[in-house]
């Protein structure tokens, strides 16, 4: 298939298709450009910085330093409902502890600011208006209740070319109706108008050529009802205006890249589009690495209590049964995943608990896994509003910043050869996107301790 990956990734609402069965192909090669490179780390201040985010920052930092480029920090704080006081300061402190001080960003200066998205609203409004004027975006007046009704009626519903004319928006309404709705102050969002019968094709530095059929893409919201941009709009505008040459981010954003390529095209910036690199997921460690005779009873009790707290509808009496089942299942930790998939003679409570255990012990590493499994998943300690939102970090566990960087660098990147211990400068010179793995990488706390 011309090296096009025809696979599904863990990302929302998009499937990769062959490029041969569609009427038109949009293609953009993003070969590495290594002169005057500019990379950004762009976290959202919604809480403590997860170790997966630190790895993303590290890969951006290493590539920038290797080629004498610029590493900048941009704070993506457009979702004010999720803003957490102190989170931005935490992010900066974590980067500085690890020796990754940005060249530009809030508090660091730079010629491309402001570096907080909440301070750049006029720019987003300007370019959103351009898309509206060109017919590449449209007003949508649907209420949250109306959208929920659509989802209840059809679980596969998505707001796309097939559905948009059945909804309340400036494409389905008469011009005078749209004018009246706007004049009356009717709440609206602005959506991207995804074209029909096209394939969006781009080159990812990790995953090679990737293709998305636009029939599988929804019309993403670009501007919310509160006048703030979504990630998609703000991200593209900022990356272009800040002259970002490489976008290194997590795999969960891979499907969104199709929308971003369209936005670059519609805004006339396609020739300046950055290179993309989507990093593999960080996965939970194998249960074999942390379950032993001493930890199994504690883990079984913890899982049963957490299940009971999250699912009170299962009844208070089930907690002891859940603990007993977990104790039995954990004894055969090597085949735990298989046991949790078995459904023979399961009652509803047991089936629900098995699903909970599967999600808790396998899959993507989450911020709750540190307390749950007994190791840090944050660089620094974080004190939240409650005990359940407070975490101990690598620094407080006694890890050195150099050891933490070395450990994180090898979570998804293979330097080749036998060397595992790297000084920071050695990491900088050795790092390349070409040796970043496609498959997810399991977190291994024993390996982290070895580096320390």
Where are these regions (language model features)?
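N-terminal catalytic cores of NTP/NDP-binding nucleotidyl/phosphoryl-transfer enzymes
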Residues: 33-94, 220, 225-256
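Residue-level signal for inorganic ion chemistry
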Residues: 60, 91, 131, 135, ...
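A glycine-rich helix N-cap at a beta->alpha junction
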Residues: 89-112
């Amino acid at each position: 298939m011309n090296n096009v990956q025809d696979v599904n990734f863990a990302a929302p609402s998009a499937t990769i298709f062959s490029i041969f069965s569609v009427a038109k192909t949009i293609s953009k090669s993003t070969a590495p450009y290594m002169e005057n490179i500019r990379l950004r780390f762009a976290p959202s201040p919604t809480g403590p910085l997860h170790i997966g985010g630190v790895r993303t920052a590290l890969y951006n930092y290493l590539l920038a330093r290797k080629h004498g480029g610029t590493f900048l920090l941009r704070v993506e704080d457009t979702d004010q409902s999720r803003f957490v006081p102190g989170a931005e300061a935490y992010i900066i402190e974590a980067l500085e502890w690890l020796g990754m001080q940005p060249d530009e960003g809030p508090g660091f200066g730079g010629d491309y600011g402001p570096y907080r998205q909440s301070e750049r609203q006029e720019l987003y409004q300007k370019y959103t208006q351009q898309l509206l004027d060109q017919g590449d975006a449209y007003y949508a007046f649907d209420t949250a209740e109306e959208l929920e009704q659509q989802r209840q009626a059809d679980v596969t519903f998505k707001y796309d070319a097939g559905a948009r004319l059945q909804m309340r928006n400036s494409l389905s309404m008469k011009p005078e109706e749209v004018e009246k709705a706007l004049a009356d102050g009717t709440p609206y969002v602005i959506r991207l108008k995804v074209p029909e019968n096209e394939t969006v094709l781009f080159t990812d530095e990790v995953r090679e050529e990737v293709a998305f059929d636009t029939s599988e893409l929804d019309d993403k919201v670009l501007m919310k009802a509160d006048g703030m941009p979504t990630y998609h709009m703000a991200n593209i505008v900022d990356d272009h205006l800040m002259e970002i040459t490489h976008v290194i981010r997590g795999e969960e954003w891979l499907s969104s890249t199709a929308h971003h390529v369209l936005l670059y095209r519609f805004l006339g910036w396609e020739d300046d589009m950055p290179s993309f690199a989507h990093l593999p997921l960080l996965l939970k460690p194998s249960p074999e690495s942390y379950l032993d005779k001493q930890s199994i009873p504690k883990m079984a009790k913890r899982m049963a209590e957490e299940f009971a707290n999250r699912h009170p509808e299962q009844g208070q009496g089930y907690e002891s049964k859940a603990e007993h089942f977990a104790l039995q299942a954990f004894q055969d930790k090597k085949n735990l995943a298989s046991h949790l998939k078995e459904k023979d003679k399961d009652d509803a409570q047991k089936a629900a608990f098995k699903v909970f255990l599967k999600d808790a012990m396998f899959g993507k590493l989450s911020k709750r896994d540190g307390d749950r499994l007994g190791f840090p998943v944050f660089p620094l300690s974080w004190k939240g509003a409650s005990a359940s939102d407070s975490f101990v970090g690598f620094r407080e566990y006694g890890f050195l910043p150099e050891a933490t960087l070395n450990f994180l660098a090898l979570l998804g990147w293979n330097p080749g050869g036998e060397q595992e211990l790297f000084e920071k400068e050695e990491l900088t010179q050795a790092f390349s996107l070409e040796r970043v793995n496609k498959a997810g990488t399991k977190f291994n706390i024993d390996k982290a301790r070895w580096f320390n």
